[in-house]
């Protein structure tokens, strides 16, 4: 099990690297995180939700993602409330203050069931477990589902990861171990120092001191590695800055307060022809070549935030001046005329009205129902090129055209409920889709970008020889190469 001294210590990428490392050595790793809190989700082949980070780890391990690898997923909705997902299916919502009392027992059962299914499957391998946050939050430790309780249940060998970039690495390590019970300390078999900058020789005395004080070997010091995969926590998004001096196209993305599935945008970060710019509510939109409004865990509340800060008006003016806009899931819903919430899925329960005005840039009406749609899809797209696309749905709202008097609007897909686009005479467009992962389709993404390049007077670019899956595999290998170079693998895998 990979434990961390804090949130953001680097557990996810280290567990991901261990999966690929073991796979290289002929073993079959099986990633597992008992409970995760994230709005960056994936949908498996059975239409079940799981954290994107565990999907990434499964690809690193050479496995198909399955919800059993992440039996409990908490998806924050704001106001200290989260949607609770057990084994891929939504089972309710919970206030943070009530979560442990109301959901601890059923969560633990979901974790044990997920483990049992994985261990009884045809996969014969070694579990690579990832903890969450700090394992020694004394006020929560007795109700901690996914750290030391799970480690003791499985008698798992544990690695403690500390982030030296944050400072205070000695206190992080000593303090974490000091707060463990004797039977928990025995499980810690190694320590990894993460995100070290500079000459590692300068830290040799630090390694000696840590090993002397703890009696636990330091397995290695990982250098600062540029973030090559989407951060699990939206708080890290603004730290993910990209400066491409050769960029010819600027994509602006609205950083919604309750943003979800920002992994949809990941294919753009490795494109040297594109500059990405995050915009928070209250900031100036400027004049990007295209604006993307991503998914939201609370579409109506995020739309209200855009309205209050004036960003909605900026977006409308940008559209009037010929700006290109594309929304994904919640972003698509915001672009419509109305958003109706009769079952109070997103609205405040005490509100008398359930109808909310959208930006009215697309003639669609969204109604939030009680049933969540989650499924992988392969659909025929009609714009800007005709081809088959793969992606997944994950939404409560259903959208329909209010009327079809606007001759410019077309359905993006043969299945007309999945998205629409209006292409204007000046070649600008406003559109959107419910299909997450749409930009991972390489040919379609390139044609979409070429549409923007054409309007700007730039030449069309050819499709990259390296597709998105190949890029992901290459990055996983680069991550693992760095891991193997700096970590004592022989001790690690024993």
Swiss-Prot record:
GO terms (BP aspect): cobalamin biosynthetic process
Pathway where this protein functions: Cofactor biosynthesis; adenosylcobalamin biosynthesis
Keyword entries, A-Z: Cobalamin biosynthesis, Glutamine amidotransferase
Entry annotation: catalytic residues: 329 (nucleophile), 436
Every GATase cobBQ-type domain range: 248-444
Superkingdom field: Bacteria
InterPro entries: Class_I_gatase-like (IPR029062), CobQ/CobB/MinD/ParA_Nub-bd_dom (IPR002586), CobQ_GATase1 (IPR033949), CobQ_synth (IPR004459), GATase_3 (IPR011698), P-loop_NTPase (IPR027417)
A GO MF term: catalytic activity
Keyword NADP carried by entry: no
UniProt xrefs under PANTHER family: COBYRIC ACID SYNTHASE (PTHR21343:SF1), DETHIOBIOTIN SYNTHETASE (PTHR21343)
Family: Belongs to the CobB/CobQ family. CobQ subfamily.
Function: Catalyzes amidations at positions B, D, E, and G on adenosylcobyrinic A,C-diamide. NH(2) groups are provided by glutamine, and one molecule of ATP is hydrogenolyzed for each amidation.
Name listed for the protein in its UniProt record: Cobyric acid synthase
Naturally occurring in which organism (per UniProt): Prochlorococcus marinus (strain NATL1A)
């Amino acid at each position: 099990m990979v434990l961390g001294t804090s949130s953001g210590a680097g557990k996810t990428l280290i567990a991901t690297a261990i999966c690929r490392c073991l796979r290289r050595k002929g073993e079959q790793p099986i990633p597992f995180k008992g409970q995760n809190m994230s709005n960056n989700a994936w949908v498996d082949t059975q239409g079940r939700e799981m954290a994107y980070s565990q999907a990434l780890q499964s690809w690193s391990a050479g496995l198909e993602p399955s919800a059993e690898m992440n039996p409990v997923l908490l998806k924050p909705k704001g106001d200290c409330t989260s949607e609770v997902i057990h084994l891929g299916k939504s089972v309710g919502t919970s206030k943070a203050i009530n979560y442990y009392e109301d959901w601890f027992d059923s969560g633990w059962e979901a974790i044990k069931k997920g483990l049992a299914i994985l261990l009884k499957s045809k996969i014969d391998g070694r579990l690579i477990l990832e903890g969450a946050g700090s394992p020694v939050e004394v006020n929560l430790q007795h109700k901690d589902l996914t750290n030391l309780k799970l480690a003791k249940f499985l008698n798992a060998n544990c690695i403690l990861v500390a982030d030296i970039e944050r400072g205070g690495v000695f206190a992080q390590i000593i303090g974490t171990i000091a707060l463990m019970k004797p039977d928990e300390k025995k499980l810690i078999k190694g320590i990894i120092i993460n995100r070290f900058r500079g000459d590692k020789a300068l830290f040799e005395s630090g390694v000696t001191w840590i090993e002397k004080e703890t009696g636990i070997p330091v397995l290695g010091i990982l250098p600062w590695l540029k973030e090559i995969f989407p951060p699990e926590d939206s708080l890290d998004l603004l730290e993910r800055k990209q400066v491409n001096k050769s960029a010819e196209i600027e994509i602006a993305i609205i950083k919604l307060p309750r943003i979800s599935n920002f992994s949809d945008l990941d294919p753009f970060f490795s494109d040297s022809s594109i500059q990405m710019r995050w915009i928070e509510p209250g900031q100036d939109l400027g004049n990007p070549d295209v604006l993307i409004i991503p998914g939201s865990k609370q579409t109506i509340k995020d739309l209200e935030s855009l309205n209050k800060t004036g960003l909605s008006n900026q977006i409308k003016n940008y559209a009037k001046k010929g700006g290109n806009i594309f929304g994904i899931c919640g972003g698509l819903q915001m672009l419509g005329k109305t958003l109706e919430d009769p079952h109070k899925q997103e609205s405040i329960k005490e509100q008398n009205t359930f109808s909310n005005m959208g930006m009215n840039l697309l003639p669609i009406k969204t109604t939030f129902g009680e049933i969540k749609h989650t499924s992988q899809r392969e659909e025929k797209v009609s714009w800007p090129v005709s081809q088959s696309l793969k992606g997944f749905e994950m939404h409560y709202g259903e959208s329909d055209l209010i009327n079809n008097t606007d001759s410019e609007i077309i359905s993006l897909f043969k299945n007309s409920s999945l998205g629409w686009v209006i292409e204007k005479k000046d070649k600008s467009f406003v559109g959107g889709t419910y299909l997450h992962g749409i930009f991972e389709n390489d040919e379609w993404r390139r044609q979409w970008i070429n549409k923007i390049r054409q309007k700007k007077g730039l030449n069309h670019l050819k499709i990259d020889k390296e597709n998105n899956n190949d890029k992901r595999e290459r990055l996983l290998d680069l991550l693992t190469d760095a891991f193997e170079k700096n970590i004592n693998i022989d001790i690690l895998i024993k």
